């Protein structure tokens, strides 16, 4: 199936998304902030990124801009607000 990167500073949210994605047969990698996501995208290949907007170190918007400057990966942005 697909390799999905889930990026959120809340481990419970990452676990919930992982549970549903793995149930559907997808492989999931997790990152706790935008900088970690950018670094993972440089070393791994993902089919989809599900990313929170508000995170420490680097927020989802900044991470999206950096990732998109290097790769063309679909990104779904999440927000609690």
Predicted region positions:
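Receiver (REC) domain active-site loop signature in two-component systems and cognate sites
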Residues: 55
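Charged docking surfaces used in two-component/phosphorelay signaling
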Residues: 15-23
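Acidic catalytic/metal-coordinating carboxylates
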Residues: 33-36, 59-62
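Short hydrophobic/Thr-rich beta-strand motif most characteristic of the beta2 strand and flanking loop
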Residues: 25-32, 40
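Conserved sequence signature across two-component system core domains
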Residues: 7-8, 31, 49
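Active-site residues of response regulator receiver
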Residues: 52, 79
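Active-site beta3 strand of CheY-like receiver
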Residues: 44-50
């Amino acid at each position: 199936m697909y390799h999905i990167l889930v990026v959120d500073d809340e481990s419970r949210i990452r676990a919930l998304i992982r549970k549903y994605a793995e149930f559907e047969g997808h492989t999931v990698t997790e990152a706790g902030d935008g900088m970690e996501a950018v670094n993972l995208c440089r070393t791994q290949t993902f089919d989809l990124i599900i990313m929170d907007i508000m995170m420490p170190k680097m927020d989802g918007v900044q991470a999206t801009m950096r990732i998109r400057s290097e790769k063309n990966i679909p990104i779904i942005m999440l927000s609690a607000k």
